[in-house]
């Protein structure tokens, strides 16, 4: 499956937002002008978009945050719409339960792309078995751990150091950094998830 491998700043400028594609220790610098679109002479972002444009931009932003392509994202929406409860919240929960995202939330990788690579390289176990599919959905109660080989990766050590420095902790995961493992305790509530995502716009887009 194709993945974007270009500059993360370009994507951030396209969406006008920090997509968490860089390590917290390497925040977007002054060269990444979020108010301007990509390109040598990117036009300053317009203050007002049409309803459709706003819905489309929100979908693109969320896709890029979680590293999901269009077809897969649409399938997530279809799945979310068949579940009980709020479709938008269901969609975010499906994205949050992806294995690469769980690895990122637990602090074993500084970005989701780094977490995806860790999973793809067979460095992650779920309930004692290696899982190399980033889109694998983790369930409440699952134990996620790094393989002995992955525990020695410098990028993992650096990520855990950054996690400790920034104090990033999420209530729906419990992590034992010394054992390089964690428990996915429960599905996150909407209040626990990023407030800068407006999932209602995505629901409106796909409901047309």
Curated annotation (Swiss-Prot):
InterPro entries: Ribosomal_uS4 (IPR022801), Ribosomal_uS4_bac-type (IPR005709), Ribosomal_uS4_CS (IPR018079), Ribosomal_uS4_N (IPR001912), S4_RNA-bd (IPR002942), S4_RNA-bd_sf (IPR036986). Signal peptide: none annotated. It comes from the Bacteria. Keywords: Ribonucleoprotein, Ribosomal protein, RNA-binding, rRNA-binding. GO terms for biological process: ribosomal small subunit biogenesis; translation. Residues 97-158 form the S4 RNA-binding domain. One of its GO terms (molecular function) is rRNA binding. It holds the Pfam family Ribosomal_S4. GO terms for cellular component: small ribosomal subunit. PANTHER family: 30S 40S RIBOSOMAL PROTEIN (PTHR11831), SMALL RIBOSOMAL SUBUNIT PROTEIN US4M (PTHR11831:SF4). Belongs to the universal ribosomal protein uS4 family. One of the primary rRNA binding proteins, it binds directly to 16S rRNA where it nucleates assembly of the body of the 30S subunit. Part of the 30S ribosomal subunit. Contacts protein S5. The interaction surface between S4 and S5 is involved in control of translational fidelity. This is Small ribosomal subunit protein uS4. It comes from Xylella fastidiosa (strain M12).
């Amino acid at each position: 499956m194709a993945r974007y491998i270009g500059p993360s700043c370009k994507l951030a400028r396209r969406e006008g937002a920090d997509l968490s594609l860089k390590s917290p220790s390497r925040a977007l610098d002054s060269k990444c002008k979020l108010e301007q679109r990509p390109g040598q002479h990117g036009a300053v972002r317009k203050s007002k978009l049409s309803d459709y444009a706003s819905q489309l931009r929100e979908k693109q932003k969320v896709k890029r945050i979680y590293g999901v392509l269009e077809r897969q994202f649409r399938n997530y929406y279809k799945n979310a719409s068949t579940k009980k409860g709020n479709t938008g919240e269901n969609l975010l929960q499906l994205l949050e339960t992806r294995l690469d995202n769980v690895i990122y939330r637990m602090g074993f990788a500084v970005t989701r792309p780094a977490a995806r690579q860790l999973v793809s390289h067979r460095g992650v176990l779920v309930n004692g078995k290696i899982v190399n599919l980033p889109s694998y959905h983790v369930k409440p109660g699952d134990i996620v751990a790094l393989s002995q080989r992955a525990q020695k990766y410098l990028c993992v050590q650096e990520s855990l150091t950054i996690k400790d420095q920034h104090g990033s902790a999420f209530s729906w995961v419990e992590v034992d950094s010394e054992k390089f493992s964690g428990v996915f305790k429960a599905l996150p509530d909407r209040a626990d998830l990023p407030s800068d995502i407006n999932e209602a716009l995505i629901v409106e887009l796909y409901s047309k």
